[in-house]
Amino acid sequence: MSMQSNSSDASSATVDPAEIAKFSRLSAQWWDPTGKMAPLHKINPLRLSFIRDAACRKFERNAKSLNCLSGLRMIDIGCGAGLLCEPFTRLGAQVIGVDPSATNIAAAKLHAEKSQLLIDYRCTTVEQMDPRERFDIVLAMEVIEHVTDVGAFLARCAAITKPGGLMVVATLNRNWKSFALAIVGAEYVMRWLPRGTHQWDKFVTPDELTKHLHNNKLAVTEQAGLVYNPLADKWSLSADMDVNYMVVAETAAG
C-alpha cells in the first residue's frame, strides 16, 4: 500500500497527488510494527505466504526452499518502504520496488541498506517505466483503491507482465460491510489507520477487478479473502471476500 511526492518525476496519468502526500506523511513509520502501520505488519505474513505459494505453484518451485523464487524477476508497484520487497529478496527473487513517493523510497532504501539487501528501488510510476521491461511476477497490493483510473493502471501492469507470468492484486471490496469494517471500524473506532486513508467509492469489487484483468488478457486462477479475528488479533485466509481480498491472475504463455 503506498502512493504530494518530493520528485517531479513521479507524475502520471493514474497517480493521485493527494494519495501520494498521504502516504508520504506515514513513510517514517513504515517499519514500526507497533505504530500506525501495525495493521500492515500483522497482515504481511499472510500476504507473503499467499504470493509465495501461488508463485511456487505456477513456476513449479518448492515453497519450503529458502531460495524458492531464485531467478524470478518481481516488481512491487506502490511498494511503500519495502515491507514485501525485503522478504521476497530473501527468497531469491530479483526485486524492483517502485513508488511515486520519494520519502517512501528513501525509507525503503535506508532499511534495505541496514538489512544488507540489494533491492532496486525507484521513485517512479508503472506508467513511466521503460515499456520494454518485463517481470515474472507483478504485485499491486492495496494500490488500485488509491489510483485515479483502475483500468488504465491495470493495463499498464499487464503490459509489463511476462507471457506466462503472474499478477497479484490485493484490494478492498465495495459494499456496506467494507464501509463498516474498513472505514468506520478501522479508521474511526479501532483507529488502526489515520482517518481518510481510504475512500469507499474507490474500492473495487471482485467482479470489476476480474473484468479489468480479463480485458487485459489475464485469467484469474486464484482468489481469497482476508478476515480479521479480533479475539485472536490474527488475520487468516477465507472464502469471505466481502472486505479485504487478493486475486492471482496469469498471462497466456508466449
Swiss-Prot record:
GO biological process entries: methylation
EC code(s) of this entry: 2.1.1.222, 2.1.1.64
GO MF assignments: 2-polyprenyl-6-hydroxyphenol methylase activity; 3-demethylubiquinol 3-O-methyltransferase activity; polyprenyldihydroxybenzoate methyltransferase activity
Entry keyword set: Methyltransferase, S-adenosyl-L-methionine, Transferase, Ubiquinone biosynthesis
Entry-linked Pfam families: Methyltransf_23
Reaction it catalyzes: a 3-demethylubiquinol + S-adenosyl-L-methionine = a ubiquinol + S-adenosyl-L-homocysteine + H(+); a 3-(all-trans-polyprenyl)benzene-1,2-diol + S-adenosyl-L-methionine = a 2-methoxy-6-(all-trans-polyprenyl)phenol + S-adenosyl-L-homocysteine + H(+)
Family affiliation: Belongs to the methyltransferase superfamily. UbiG/COQ3 family.
Protein name: Ubiquinone biosynthesis O-methyltransferase
Gene that produces this protein: ubiG
